Amino acid sequence: MFGTATRTHATRVLLLGSGELGKEVAIECQRLGLEVIACDRYANAPAMQVAHRSYVIDMLDGQALEEIINKEQPAYVVPEIEAIATDKLVELEEQGLNVVPTAKATKLTMNREGIRRLAAEELALNTSPYQFADSFEDFKAAVEHVGIPCVVKPVMSSSGKGQSVIKTEEDVQTAWEYAQEGGRTGAGRVIVEGFIDFDYEITLLTVRAVDGVHFCAPIGHRQEDGDYRESWQPQAMSENAIKAAEYTAEKVVNALGGYGIFGVELFVKGDKVIFNEVSPRPHDTGMVTMISQEMSEFTLHVHAFTGMPINNIVQYGPSASAVILGQGTSTDIRFDNLSKAMAQPQTQVRLFGKPEIDGRRRLGVVLTRRKTIEDSIEDAVNSASKVQIIY
């Protein structure tokens, strides 16, 4: 049962994080007449622009989080980012709060150590070799154990922050220092991951709902500096690789529990898959589903966590997304040349409405659907390059 927004019996959804993914979740909630409250650490974040109300808070502050939850009495608390006081969510969930998909999932996936130990040690899934380190001495030992080349990441970071590749012994000190600067909560623990040989990487959007576990077609993507630049669906895979990917994803999402969409990141080598990470929420590479599927990842997420069946996920054919990346400084960003960017049929531009930029920031995305994946990617990239950003 849903109440009507702004009325006495309104069904309220509290978004923790109000970026471009949260904005699309908010819009899907609005389509169901749900009342949306958006939180973030800065004002006028994208989801705040389409919410009924908003709050600017430090979401790592458990007391501030609890005060808003007590005030708003949401039916659903929906984390959109990792940097949240997850211990407080666990505590409040034990008192009856509905955290999407679960507070456990939010806490485990906030920290690379939690989810890696779950996947490798509890679920016995294939992962890259890894070691954790708290000090520089432990870090050097971890690098030696895992071997060079290797990848270094803070256990708590996102969007590539603090991540680097150690290619020679000379990189060890620099990699440690960079990881200490890039963590979400400042200096701290890191993971050292061994290099693995893979053909490509995918995001397998996996929905856990009242009518079971459902899979979207696999999404391929290209990363640069730890952030995605293009994604496409479907990624060509062998039948055995798809079965292995779905097996891995289902084990992970069932271990995390709850209802919603999960972005399961996997490396693929031939018919073999290697688990990388999982986000218990819509995934940035999944923005392609806004043009490639009948129900986008955001629609699927909202339908799942509100208890609706998913039934069948319809995929429309070769589609792609390409990021509109800004580089500059402004508190009054403008966009031009959009008519040329959208000159071709089955091409869409989504601008996120981010209020400011200082450096490099993802400001929008181009979505295309063509006869082939190659044409979809090429046209998406070309269209994105035509968008003129005025700082």
From Swiss-Prot:
Domain ATP-grasp: 117-306
Protein's pathway: Purine metabolism; IMP biosynthesis via de novo pathway; N(2)-formyl-N(1)-(5-phospho-D-ribosyl)glycinamide from N(1)-(5-phospho-D-ribosyl)glycinamide (formate route): step 1/1
Name of the gene encoding the protein in the UniProt record: purT
Role, per record: Involved in the de novo purine biosynthesis. Catalyzes the transfer of formate to 5-phospho-ribosyl-glycinamide (GAR), producing 5-phospho-ribosyl-N-formylglycinamide (FGAR). Formate is provided by PurU via hydrolysis of 10-formyl-tetrahydrofolate.
Complexes and interactors: Homodimer.
Molecular function GO labels: ATP binding; magnesium ion binding; phosphoribosylglycinamide formyltransferase 2 activity; phosphoribosylglycinamide formyltransferase activity
Disulfide cysteine pairs (residue numbers): none
Primary enzyme class: ligase
UniProt name for this protein: Formate-dependent phosphoribosylglycinamide formyltransferase
GO CC, alphabetical: cytosol
Annotated residues for binding of N(1)-(5-phospho-beta-D-ribosyl)glycinamide: E20, L21, E80, D284, K354, R361, R362
Cross-referenced InterPro entries: ATP-grasp, ATP-grasp_carboxylate-amine, ATP_grasp_subdomain_1, PreATP-grasp_dom_sf, PurT, PurT/PurK_preATP-grasp, PurT_C, Rudment_hybrid_motif
Pfam families in the cross-refs: ATP-grasp (PF02222), PurT_C (PF21244), RS_preATP-grasp-like (PF22660)
Positions that bind Mg(2+): E265, E277
Keyword Repressor listed: no
Gene3D superfamilies: 3.40.50.20, ATP-grasp fold, A domain, ATP-grasp fold, B domain
NCBIfam families hit by this protein: PRK09288.1 (NF006766), purT (TIGR01142)
Record-linked SUPFAM superfamilies: Glutathione synthetase ATP-binding domain-like, PreATP-grasp domain, Rudiment single hybrid motif
EC number, as in UniProt: 6.3.1.21
